[in-house]
């Protein structure tokens, strides 16, 4: 099947060039006069390394003039020599699309890693495609209910929107993404595409095995370009995953979830490639084309009429600095931001979402409803007031607070603990079953806590549980002791 904005291969026969220079992952290739390949075309070259033949794929990045092109290698260039013959494939890097990709692991070039050769006989799409036209975009706004209390109440996700998970190392970004994949597969029977961009190979293996164990692998396609791969691969793997997701949206008319872990590594790979191509670095050493590269990716992640791609993107924040150009550029494209805070994680509250700094553009009465909005604002007000009182408590102690402030602090502590929740993917570590809390129950529970119905309950009764039934059961257990 062909779509209007699908990249089509050239009808011309393959053109051969030769390697004239190799500088790490950057390769200069000379072609016959007038037969230079187009930008983003895939080139292939055969090499022999220690008596083992392999094919290296290159992607055209620049036209240098004098019939020379500069290409970025998608594999280590060991064994590549000057004079080696290079073939222009006449089309961009292409990946398999459709049901064949579900339940399997691919690399950025579309090669199946768990079942070599899978998908190469079927339909393939080029990874460089135009975003949907303006008149194809969906105008209505709809909430994506996750069953995670802190998200549904305070930073609701938009169906077909872009969500950023911000946080430093080790605060739970990948765990939250794994939990979302599990919940979407269980609750909505939806299709998910996971793009592992520049993260640890061990995490990719763990994710594959966990999804297989939990029975959600058959509804998910996984595309990996991990930390040990060349920068060209890490820069393109997000586009490969997005292309698979676009097929499910545009051809199969499905609502798709696209998970990208980690979007910062996409930026980092672009910076490496930019330096290798000889471009002058911009702020903090990033590439001068940072905003443009991010826009090309993000503009394709959108809802069209009747179907959507909802994207959840983990964003590593270097040294917890939110003014760094990489996370700052990502902010501009997001509909909701979920900030994971180290200070909350240190209290043992997971997910470690900071309710005061996380945002959502749809948290307004006209979209989520008056009651939801009012309860969310009450929760935020109590938590904010508690934060303001912490300095006084640290210096003078709780006894110096007014009675009203004491009640506020005690309710804030209960709310803070109740915002934590058991995850399905963490069951085998904690021994506590995961919980799904419907949005209506979440709103009702927080309204009752804000009203003071549970002021007599100890804070420990609210630790990382599901709904109010769990709180009451925990309280009953504590009183029996």
Swiss-Prot record:
Coiled coil: none annotated. HAMAP family: ATP_synth_beta_bact. Produces ATP from ADP in the presence of a proton gradient across the membrane. The catalytic sites are hosted primarily by the beta subunits. NCBIfam families: atpD. F-type ATPases have 2 components, CF(1) - the catalytic core - and CF(0) - the membrane proton channel. CF(1) has five subunits: alpha(3), beta(3), gamma(1), delta(1), epsilon(1). CF(0) has three main subunits: a(1), b(2) and c(9-12). The alpha and beta chains form an alternating ring which encloses part of the gamma chain. CF(1) is attached to CF(0) by a central stalk formed by the gamma and epsilon chains, while a peripheral stalk is formed by the delta and b chains. Keywords: ATP synthesis, ATP-binding, Cell membrane, CF(1), Hydrogen ion transport, Ion transport, Membrane, Nucleotide-binding, Translocase, Transport. GO terms for molecular function: ATP binding; ATP hydrolysis activity; proton-transporting ATP synthase activity, rotational mechanism. This is ATP synthase subunit beta. It is an enzyme of class 7 (translocase). Its EC number is 7.1.2.2. It comes from the Bacteria. It is a peripheral membrane protein. It holds the Pfam family ATP-synt_VA_C. ATP binds at residues 167-174. Transmembrane segments: none annotated.
